[in-house]
Amino acid sequence: CIRDRASISALGKGPSTGKDCLIDKNSDKTLFRRCAVNNAAYDYYKQCQATGVTMPPKNLRFWILNILRPSSTLMMHHGALLDSKLVSKYLGKYSSLIRIFAPDITIGSRDKNGNYAELYSTTVHEMAHASHFSKVGTDYWRKYATYIITSFINTGDAYGTGNGENAGYCQVGEMWGYFMENSLYKERYGRDPGYGQNYWFAPRIFSELESGGLTRADICSCLNYYVNDLKSLKAALLENYAAKSSLINKVFKKYSR
């Protein structure tokens, strides 16, 4: 379910077999945003099928918010119980719609209108978080999302400095989100955009582990409920992939803070 300010777009009547039409940056802006997000989400599902990465939950509910640039994976429609006052501050004038259209994913499209690549990368990043949610559940997600929202409200930066309560949840989650975003962007556009490299967490850890022989599915399999900081992440990787211990130790040492 994809919503843009709780409105709908239609392409008119067509046969039950489907309808071909060209939607580009010169088309209706709302329709373009929805198509870009829909296509990116579909591509992510296909990537999960091909690589063995855990699928996001079914029936995800998207909000596309042109008033915001940041995006988020709140998973409210799937039961993540977040502080309503915090979410209201984050969503601003759309807060009154929370109870009616509890979002799983919000896509902040401000300054991205007509830019397919940015909408694509943003969407697959949030879809990677939804895969993570499938692994860890609602209690874990409440701590993670609360850290993100609180940091954004207090500082304007969703990730903070890495020192706040539950920062480790953010560390693991954003490493995974940026790793998948960069990987899928590179496969689609032929270059690594390097998103997330200047923050206090290190998505390159996963990139180098993949280059050393661990698959995305291997990495995803370690993102369980008990992995909530870099120390527990490393321990899970070593426990599950002891044959790669030399690689794991080397990479984590390289990116230790």
Which residues does each PLM region occupy?
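Active-site scaffold of zinc-dependent metalloenzymes
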Residues: 75-137, 147-148
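Auxiliary, metal-adjacent structural segments of Zn-dependent hydrolase domains
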Residues: 34-102
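Second-shell loop/turn segments in exported
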Residues: 26-35, 109-114, 118, 162-168, ...
